[in-house]
Amino acid sequence: MWVITHALTGMSLGAVLGQRGAPLWAVVAAALLLHVLLDMVPHWDYVRTRHRVIWSLGDVGATAALLIWAATLGDASWAVLLAGAVSALPDLDVLNALWPGERRIRIFPSHWSGFPHGSAPPVPGTVVQAAVWVASVLVMWNAGW
């Protein structure tokens, strides 16, 4: 999934868990688990495209803008911010798209070659992510954030 998809789903998880009074350590653990689970859903990743540098800069930039907005103007709780950041953090390895050459370093276990990472063609894979964005926003709205 894209970095922003992980951030949005993490934020929605943080909104729900924060509303229920979950401790921050549990929010962090749940956000990491959510990242792994979402990576198994069939989706399209831009990391193997010709324009991966543009995609990764846009994705990471949009995610940073979202989290900064949530922290400053959005009045987000610590649970929302932490879950959003932690869920997105493993995908920062997309920034190695900026490096020359084809070798890609993957640090997070769900990014390793043996992990059952979901894959889909660009259009349906992007539609899946857009549906996840909408669901995440609805969950946050329903949780009062």
Question: Where in this protein do the model-derived segments appear?
Answer:
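N-terminal membrane-targeting hydrophobic helices
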Residues: 1-145
